[in-house]
């Protein structure tokens, strides 16, 4: 099944995967602590505005609470910025998702995102037909296609004694959905947020 890009979040852990039929020549890179999806050097040139973006960021709130943001587009940055200003996770997700709306491409691709705290998680999606933002207490997935409403997801990395961001990225990259490209993972505990990525989709 092809679900496109997807986010999985739970308290303390999150992940994001790029699945793509149109632009498979992409990788995640670490740019000054922000994980960025972008084209590989051999990728064909494109003017598509949705191909490159920050997909994961670690932030601190004004009360020094560590959080991580994952998502499939340019909305990740304003979500992170609102969290840094002290917005609750619900509002930090809802405001940029509503303002930027679904992607204006041929498929009306939804924007998806999640905010992960050490003991909390919130997931959001804006589609042509609606906006959903909800707090979750177990691993939950939302995708751009097919699974475009939040639903429970079996994420083994969330059950580890010590959750690992790299393990989360690798697990979702290997998930049984078509056209995997690359993935990012995030973990959050009292000491801070950790980001990792996996580009080995073979």
UniProtKB/Swiss-Prot annotation:
It comes from the Archaea. Its EC number is 3.5.4.10. Pathway: Purine metabolism; IMP biosynthesis via de novo pathway; IMP from 5-formamido-1-(5-phospho-D-ribosyl)imidazole-4-carboxamide: step 1/1. GO terms for molecular function: IMP cyclohydrolase activity. It is an enzyme of class 3 (hydrolase). Pfam families: IMP_cyclohyd (PF07826). InterPro entries: IMP_cyclohydrolase (IPR010191), IMP_cyclohydrolase-like (IPR020600), IMP_cyclohydrolase-like_sf (IPR036795). It catalyses: IMP + H2O = 5-formamido-1-(5-phospho-D-ribosyl)imidazole-4-carboxamide. Keywords: Hydrolase, Purine biosynthesis. GO terms for biological process: 'de novo' IMP biosynthetic process. SUPFAM superfamilies: Archaeal IMP cyclohydrolase PurO. Residues 27-48 are annotated as: Disordered. Belongs to the archaeal IMP cyclohydrolase family. Catalyzes the cyclization of 5-formylamidoimidazole-4-carboxamide ribonucleotide to IMP. This is IMP cyclohydrolase. It comes from Halorubrum lacusprofundi (strain ATCC 49239 / DSM 5036 / JCM 8891 / ACAM 34).
